[in-house]
């Protein structure tokens, strides 16, 4: 007969009418009983023949995440001009006196941050924007391009101009100025011309000598023709990269080209569309180099669009436009939905490319990307704005993956010990926190994003792609991309972006100038940065408790008025360092702080309400007697595990689920086990912070146990010898139930760790409930007053130790040893400090 829930509760000693604990509890360690209960609850039956369930409520398997929804109305968020002050260490020292070694080291790590991957895999430009929304491909393309453009304008990205140069906006850092070769001078169009090939008059180029002269500028190599001068076409030409020098005289004009996006790595810049430092002659030469068909390593020829020259065309007809977009102006409409109609809406479509305010030399950077991008909702509560997702997961995968540095994450007990107090709280919102931290330009070639331009993107998405064929580019090829969908999309986007449609239809390659969110190193760097800043703030304002985790910064003070005055001073200090705060998102919490998914008050810590609701929904949807895919179980355990420390039986209650995940088998919930878990999560108990003097001690041997409660001594024996850790755990449970003490001295490290997941399942669950809210303090065996009773000797009474229990805060301690501060720095605010009143340093 299956085990009923009531019977199971009695067995686990969760009901009051259980027998004496000394008799009942050791039985739960019995292996035979644990096996029988597991069979009754269907916990051990992992091999099932029924099909697995792959979805429970919102939880799906690990590899089938929910499909993001595209919002055509997405707004691109605006980014302030973020420029973290380079002399941040000096500024902090002026404010607070000498910095600690720790603070200095952390701040030096991010000024500038460096990134050294073992191996970088370069992907074709086609993979730059991920085709996440096939229904809205064009819309997604332009919105993503606009987002990237916004980031570049805000100084967060570099734009690759040539293989070895990039431009950027915003204030340069000293390590960038060392690498500059002068600013772009926009008037001198021969060197740094802002006009790109679209707007070049045909007059200059039509008289340029072509033919033998072109050959003379290029030297033959085994890779085909190579330029002798730097910026003509650095990098390897493809297998068919020879230049067709036999050009009819009438074609001596500049033809445009969209550089090929897939294929061999040739380190051309955005090819002819970016202005290289070339003379008119070399521009002509390069235009022929570009228009020749190149064979790509992926096996198909990449067709580059250009206008077939007609001998009848006279010089007086004006310039031939080289841009894919502008070529439509001179062509006849192919249908009602031809792009010619859109291109003719405007006379001036602006330049093909934009240049940044500053130019910089960079390590050799190929015309490729190293990660894809796509857009999603900014967060579940804000669907009007978009967020750019950058996938640099190549650095975290495979045999060449980078081992990212570990950093301290405060656990629940540490957080409670630090923040559970009667302080008044507020949290600061750092806007675009990741984009505060500058990256060294040497990291740019590893962190590239971009796009191959609209024609290639559209061609790649249409399955019947006629753009990529093995013939020469003709006028017909130009119109191959015309379609009703594209026409309608572009017409709608024209209202939003206007003449920028032209700019965004060109290819672009961008490298990160500030740390990207998708890089594995970024969380570590952000954690170092904010923790160092908070450490400085705590010493500048000794009456304020400042604490941070990633970009979440909280301030605590004794009263609301005090908190407000601190808030003003600290905000000004952070702004002086170049840290951007979002004043609209400052949250005032009163005495209950919401932080990292917890509510923390003077009474202790509990999970936030939205997590409790999620758990209730999860149980409502949880099927009984149906095998659930172990990947879904991982999701369920993730949610339940977060709140496990607040339940009666804690983590041990979830052990059967952990076991099934480890063995990669499906898990079947029996009605009793589900009811047991439901009841566990119905009543959550706060985790609290305590300090006390230890008066109760427990010890055990495999055959017996002993307690010292004040001046009383007790002992008992086990029916059968037990493993030493199990015996020590039982002794601790007896000490708690006999004395009611919240603080117990023990010499066993496993009991001390309070992780009872390795014990027999039933015992682990029961012990977790009995020892809830109990704290342990380590006492060496030789000094343990309970040592003699556990060995059966009651006559000898060792003196009780005066052991004060101080809550630990793990590696997230607040107390930096403060160097001596010069006397001329006045106290900021004269209030009793919470660190001295409400706090005893751990």
Curated annotation (Swiss-Prot):
The UniProt record lists the keyword Metal-binding: yes
Alphabetical UniProt keywords: DNA replication, DNA-binding, DNA-directed DNA polymerase, Endonuclease, Host-virus interaction, Hydrolase, Inhibition of host innate immune response by virus, Inhibition of host RLR pathway by virus, Magnesium, Metal-binding, Multifunctional enzyme, Nuclease, Nucleotidyltransferase, RNA-directed DNA polymerase, Transferase, Viral immunoevasion
Residue(s) at site: Priming of reverse-transcription by covalently linking the first nucleotide of the (-)DNA: 63
Enzyme Commission numbers on file: 2.7.7.7, 2.7.7.49, 3.1.26.4
Residue span(s) of domain Reverse transcriptase: 357-600
Miscellaneous notes: Hepadnaviral virions contain probably just one P protein molecule per particle.
Record protein name field: Protein P
Origin species: Hepatitis B virus genotype C subtype adr (isolate Korea/Kim/1989) (HBV-C)
């Amino acid at each position: 007969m299956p085990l009923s829930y009531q019977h199971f509760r009695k067995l686990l000693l969760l009901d009051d009418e259980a027998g004496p604990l000394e008799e009942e509890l050791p039985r739960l360690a019995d292996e035979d009983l644990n096996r029988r209960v597991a069979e009754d609850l269907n916990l051990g039956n992992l091999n099932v023949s029924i099909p697995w369930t792959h979805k429970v409520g919102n939880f799906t398997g690990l590899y089938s995440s929910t499909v993001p929804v595209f919002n055509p109305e997405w707004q691109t968020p605006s980014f302030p001009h973020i420029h973290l002050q380079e002399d941040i260490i000096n500024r902090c020292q002026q404010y607070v006196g000498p910095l600690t070694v720790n603070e200095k080291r952390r701040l030096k790590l991010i000024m500038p941050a460096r990134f050294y991957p073992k191996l970088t895999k370069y992907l074709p430009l086609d993979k730059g924007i991920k085709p996440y929304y096939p229904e809205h491909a064009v819309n997604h393309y332009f919105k993503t391009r606009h987002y990237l453009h916004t980031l570049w304008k805000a100084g967060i990205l570099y734009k690759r101009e040539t293989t070895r140069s990039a431009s950027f906006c915003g204030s340069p850092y000293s390590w960038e100025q060392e690498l500059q070769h002068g600013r772009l001078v926009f008037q001198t169009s021969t060197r740094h011309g802002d006009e790109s090939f679209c707007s070049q008059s045909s007059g200059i180029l039509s008289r340029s000598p072509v033919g033998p002269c072109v050959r003379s500028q290029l030297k033959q190599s085994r890779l085909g023709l190579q330029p002798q001068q730097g910026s003509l076409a650095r990098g390897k030409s493809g297998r068919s990269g020879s230049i067709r020098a036999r050009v009819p005289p009438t074609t001596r004009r500049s033809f445009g080209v969209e550089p090929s996006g897939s294929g061999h790595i040739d380190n051309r810049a955005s090819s002819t569309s970016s202005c290289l430092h070339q003379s008119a002659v070399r521009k002509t030469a390069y235009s022929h180099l570009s228009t020749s068909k190149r064979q790509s390593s992926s096996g198909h020829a990449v067709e580059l669009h250009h206008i077939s020259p007609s001998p009848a065309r006279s010089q007086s007809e004006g310039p031939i436009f080289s841009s894919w977009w502008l070529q439509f102006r001179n062509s006849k409409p192919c249908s009602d939905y031809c792009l010619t109609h859109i291109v003719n809406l405007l006379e001036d479509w602006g330049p093909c490319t934009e240049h940044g305010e500053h130019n910089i030399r960079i390590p050799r950077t190929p015309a490729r990307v190293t990660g894809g991008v796509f857009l999603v909702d900014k967060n579940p509560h804000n669907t009007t704005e978009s967020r750019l997702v950058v996938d640099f997961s190549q650095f975290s995968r495979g045999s060449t993956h980078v081992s990212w540095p570990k950093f301290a994450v405060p656990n629940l007990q540490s957080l409670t010990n630090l923040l559970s107090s009667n302080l008044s709280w507020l949290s600061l919102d750092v806007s675009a926190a990741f984009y505060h931290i500058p990256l060294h330009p040497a990291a740019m070639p590893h962190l590239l994003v971009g796009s191959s331009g609209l024609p290639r993107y559209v061609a790649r998405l249409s399955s019947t792609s006629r753009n990529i064929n093995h013939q020469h580019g003709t006028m017909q090829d130009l119109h191959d991309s015309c379609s009703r969908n594209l026409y309608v999309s572009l017409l709608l986007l024209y209202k939003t972006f206007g003449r920028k449609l032209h700019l965004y239809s060109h290819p672009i390659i961008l490298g990160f100038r500030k740390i990207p969110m998708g890089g594995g190193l970024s969380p570590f760097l952000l954690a170092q940065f904010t923790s160092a800043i908070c450490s400085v703030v705590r010493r500048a304002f000794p009456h304020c408790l400042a604490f941070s985790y990633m970009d979440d910064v909280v301030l605590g003070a004794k009263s609301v008025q005090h908190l407000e005055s601190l808030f003003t001073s600290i905000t000004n200090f952070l702004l002086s360092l170049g840290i951007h705060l979002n004043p609209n998102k400052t949250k005032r919490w009163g005495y209950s702080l919401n932080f990292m998914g917890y509510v923390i008050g003077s009474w202790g810590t509990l999970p936030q309400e939205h997590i409790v609701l999620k758990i209730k929904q999860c149980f409502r949807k949880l099927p009984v007697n149906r095998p659930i895919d172990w990947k879904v179980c991982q999701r369920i355990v993730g949610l339940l595990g977060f709140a496990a420390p607040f339940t009666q039986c804690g983590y041990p209650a979830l052990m059967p689920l952990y076991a099934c995940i480890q063995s990669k088998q499906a898990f079947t919930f029996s009605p009793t086990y589900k009811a047991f878990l439901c009841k566990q999560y119905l009543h959550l108990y706060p985790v609290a912070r305590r300090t006390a003097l230890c008066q109760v001690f427990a010890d055990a041997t495999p055959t017996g146990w002993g307690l010292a409660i004040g001046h009383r001594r007790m002992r008992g024996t086990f029916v059968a010898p037990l493993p030493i850790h199990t015996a020590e755990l039982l002794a601790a449970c007896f000490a708690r139930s006999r004395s009611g003490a919240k603080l117990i001295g023990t010499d066993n490290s496993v009991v001390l760790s309070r992780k009872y997941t390795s014990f027999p399942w039933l015992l682990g669950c029961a012990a977790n409930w009995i020892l809830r809210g109990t704290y342990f303090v380590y006492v060496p065996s030789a000094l343990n007053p309970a040592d003699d009773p556990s060995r059966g000797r009651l006559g000898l009474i060792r003196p009780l130790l005066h052991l004060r229990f101080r809550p630990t805060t793990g590696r997230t301690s607040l107390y930096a040893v403060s160097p001596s501060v010069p006397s001329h720095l006045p106290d900021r605010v004269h209030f009793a400090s919470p660190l001295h009143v409400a706090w005893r340093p751990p």
